[in-house]
């Protein structure tokens, strides 16, 4: 039987009741249990999406039926699932979330015992078990047990606060998108000594205040609020709070690459990032910059392999190996608050980071068409540009030009898009590169 592809760059994700169903969740639970040897313990959490009520029951049933114990920790941020899996000595963790996707989406992400997301090799094993239906039920006396753990939230909060030293009174506005960080993130910042104003901090899976994707279009209210109350910093989370984006004291959204470079400067040692990160990383950090495929698990793997000090994606997904191998938007926000508290205004700190014209574009492309479009992308791009210095095909196709301009064309692993990311010290050239790439993609869809 052909193996069904379930996982993208960030777990399983799709539209509810068409791509992601209770049957799928049940059988993923059984498949995970089989992978674990029909024994052990799994931590289970979920974000604020309304459809998590049914998915939670379904995947839990699959795990229990197959002999695995389940620890439910309820509605929590994704990083708390990674943290709990590690601290409670579980064999795996499961988070039900579609992160920044709209309300009609949901998904499943699986975590290792150390709090790191499942690797692509592990996900492939789950897909093989799922596709072949090679999972089995256990006898009645070997069915897994279910318990609820509410104490781990408090432990997580205390450990987060202990990671930073923020001067009392820093004014912070936190926009949680009505997502999984709504309860914990503001509480953590208050316990850390900040004066906190909240936006969209009532959990609601319909995301009534704003779309959970933390970008400039969706953060207009946060930008205005930071200026209106004279705050030092704005923090925006996505739907499950594994990401964080900042607004400076002037109400401006921080450039994603520059923000990552600013935090990376604080660490000695090597830094891991992805192929879509900009030149400012290489020009700012103390150690080596190691690039890998997009996706937090890819960053985590290289952090472990190279014993790196810190890692992250320009999207605001940052990993702090001194805390947990799960990306943590709340800790990322705390560390930015600590930086502003001790070193000055965010806008001025960002001026220290080199900044060049950077363009991010996305072209709608169905899942079925993405593979075909990307098949010949390297040749199409090579035929369209004549000053190429280097080609990197670790994740999509990245061209670096003789003047260090670069462009990355890659299929989204979570949505129906092909993404273009590019950077050049010459804004005219940046625009020309973008137009050429858009034309190539549209002509081949």
Swiss-Prot record:
Catalytic activity, as annotated: alpha-D-glucosamine 1-phosphate = D-glucosamine 6-phosphate
Cofactor annotation comment: Binds 1 Mg(2+) ion per subunit.
GO biological process: carbohydrate metabolic process
Keyword Magnesium: yes
Keywords: Isomerase, Magnesium, Metal-binding, Phosphoprotein
Pfam families per record: PGM_PMM_I (PF02878), PGM_PMM_II (PF02879), PGM_PMM_III (PF02880), PGM_PMM_IV (PF00408)
Phosphoserine: residues bearing it: 99
Catalytic residues (positions): 99
CDD domains assigned to the protein according to its UniProt record, in alphabetical order: PGM_like1
Binding site for Mg(2+): 99, 238, 240, 242
Cofactor(s) essential for the protein: Mg(2+)
PTM per Swiss-Prot/TrEMBL: Activated by phosphorylation.
PANTHER family per the UniProt record, alphabetical: PHOSPHOMANNOMUTASE
Job description of the protein: Catalyzes the conversion of glucosamine-6-phosphate to glucosamine-1-phosphate.
Name of the molecule in the record: Probable phosphoglucosamine mutase
């Amino acid at each position: 039987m052909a193996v069904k592809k379930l996982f993208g760059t960030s777990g399983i994700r799709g539209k509810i009741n068409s791509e992601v169903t209770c049957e799928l969740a049940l059988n993923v639970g059984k498949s995970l249990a089989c992978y674990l040897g029909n024994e052990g313990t799994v931590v289970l959490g979920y974000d604020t999406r309304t459809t998590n009520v049914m998915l939670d029951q379904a995947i839990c049933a699959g795990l229990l039926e197959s002999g695995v114990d389940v620890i439910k920790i309820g509605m929590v941020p994704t990083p708390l699932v990674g943290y709990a899996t590690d601290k409670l000595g579980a064999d795996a963790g499961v988070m039900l979330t579609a992160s920044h996707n709209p309300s009609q989406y949901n998904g499943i992400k699986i975590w290792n015992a150390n709090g790191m997301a499942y690797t692509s090799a592990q996900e492939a094993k789950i897909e093989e078990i799922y596709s072949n239906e090679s999972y089995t039920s256990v006898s009645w006396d070997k069915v897994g047990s279910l318990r609820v753990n509410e104490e781990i939230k408090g432990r997580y909060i205390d450990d987060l606060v202990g990671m930073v030293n923020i001067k009392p009174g820093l004014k912070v506005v936190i926009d949680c998108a009505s997502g999984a960080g709504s309860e914990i993130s503001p509480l953590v910042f208050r316990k850390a000594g900040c004066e906190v104003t909240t936006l969209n901090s009532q959990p609601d899976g319909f995301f009534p205040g704003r779309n959970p994707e933390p970008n400039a279009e969706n953060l207009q209210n946060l930008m205005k609020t930071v200026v209106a109350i004279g705050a030092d910093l704005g923090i925006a989370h996505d739907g499950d709070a594994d990401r964080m984006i900042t607004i400076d004291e002037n109400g401006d959204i921080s450039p994603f690459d520059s923000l990552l470079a600013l935090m990376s400067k604080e660490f000695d040692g090597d830094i891991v990032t992805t192929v879509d990160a900009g030149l400012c990383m290489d020009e700012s950090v103390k150690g080596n910059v190691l690039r890998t495929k997009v996706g937090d698990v890819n960053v985590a793997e290289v952090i472990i392999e190279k014993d790196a000090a810190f890692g992250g994606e320009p999207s605001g997904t940052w990993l702090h190996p001194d805390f947990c191998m799960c990306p943590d938007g709340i800790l990322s926000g705390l560390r930015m608050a600590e930086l502003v508290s001790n070193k000055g205004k965010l806008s001025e700190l960002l001026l220290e980071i080199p900044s060049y014209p950077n363009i991010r574009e996305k072209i709608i492309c169905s899942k079925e068409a993405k593979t075909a479009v990307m098949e010949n992308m390297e040749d199409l791009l090579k035929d369209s540009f004549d000053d190429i210095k280097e080609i990197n095909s670790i994740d999509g196709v990245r061209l670096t030009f003789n003047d260090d301009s670069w462009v990355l064309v890659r299929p989204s692993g979570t949505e129906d898009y092909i993404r273009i990311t590019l950077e050049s010290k010459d804004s005219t050239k940046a625009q020309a590169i973008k137009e050429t790439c858009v034309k190539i993609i549209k002509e081949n869809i």
